[in-house]
């Protein structure tokens, strides 16, 4: 059992600036759905350099899952912290054709200004991935021994694109592809936390998926909720 002194020891080893800089570095690496290999290799190298056991899960020629493990004694339950590294846009100059009017201050790469991190994928969800990477490093360096494994899974293919009809290329293989591959190829845990925004509260995440094709005209964009309820609602809404 980790007591308050152990907890403080770990927290003191976590730097806000390191989290921000690592988020920036992740945003500097283009990782659209279907092309997550480069960022995955970066994460695996980072794990190895900081004493976290790296596990490479091959998905296809262009994508991998990057998993790190802070190993326990094998006498307790395991916990996975999961986050995706793919983004809706490409991270190239092509994006400006679509995003210039919608988000004129957006950065293609990463930037830290006025105490904030900017860049494609910063909020969804490279900041969450950077946070658990830094936390894993701090946990490992603390020397505190866990009973069970702490698994840090940076996965491909979460963005809600699904191969339907003529849309069958790698860029449409999202909707949980990476996590499904993770679980069916040997990386499993007793419990899991998704490193997405939730206001530090327990929230409903997703209770199902409806795949509907709708054709529209105009500037492309995405629809999502930027905030979540502070407490789970009585009705199981996403």
Regions found by a protein language model. Give the residues of each.
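Midchain, well-structured core segments that form catalytic/ion-binding scaffolds
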Residues: 173-238
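Glycine-rich, phosphate-binding/catalytic loops in enzymes
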Residues: 96-101, 135, 169-170, 210-212, ...
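Beta-strand secondary-structure signal
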Residues: 67, 151, 211-215
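Short acidic, glycine/serine/threonine-rich loops at helix termini
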Residues: 93-94, 162-167, 204-206
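Hydrophobic/aromatic beta-strand patches that form the interior of the parallel beta-sheet core
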Residues: 55, 79-81, 153, 191-193, ...
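Acidic, glycine-rich active-site loops and adjacent beta-strand->loop/helix elements
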Residues: 85-87, 116, 153-173, 187, ...
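Active-site metal-coordination/substrate-binding segment of hydrolases
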Residues: 76-151, 160-162
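N-terminal helical capping/dimerization or prosegment-like subdomains
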Residues: 2-92, 96-98
């Amino acid at each position: 059992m980790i007591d308050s002194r152990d907890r403080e020891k770990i927290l003191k080893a976590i730097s806000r600036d390191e989290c921000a800089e690592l988020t920036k570095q992740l945003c500097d690496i283009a990782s659209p759905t279907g092309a997550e290999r480069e960022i995955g290799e970066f994460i695996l190298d980072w794990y190895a350099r900081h004493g976290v056991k790296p596990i490479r899960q091959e998905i296809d020629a262009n994508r991998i899952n990057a998993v790190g493990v802070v190993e326990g004694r094998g006498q307790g339950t395991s916990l996975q912290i999961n986050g995706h590294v793919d983004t809706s846009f490409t991270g190239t100059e092509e994006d400006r054709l679509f995003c210039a009017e919608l988000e004129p201050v957006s950065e293609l790469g990463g930037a830290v200004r006025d105490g904030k991190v900017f860049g494609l994928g910063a909020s969804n969800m490279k900041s969450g991935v950077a946070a658990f990477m830094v936390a894993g490093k701090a946990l490992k360096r603390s020397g505190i021994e866990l009973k069970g494994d702490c698994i840090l899974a940076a996965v491909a293919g979460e963005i809600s694109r699904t191969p339907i009809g003529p849309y069958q290329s790698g860029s449409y293989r999202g909707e949980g592809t990476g996590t499904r591959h993770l679980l069916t190829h040997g990386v499993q845990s007793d419990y899991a936390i998704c490193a997405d925004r939730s206001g530090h509260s327990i929230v409903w995440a997703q209770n199902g998926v409806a795949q509907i094709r709708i054709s529209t005209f105009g500037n492309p964009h995405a629809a999502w909720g930027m905030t979540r309820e502070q407490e789970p609602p009585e009705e199981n809404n996403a």
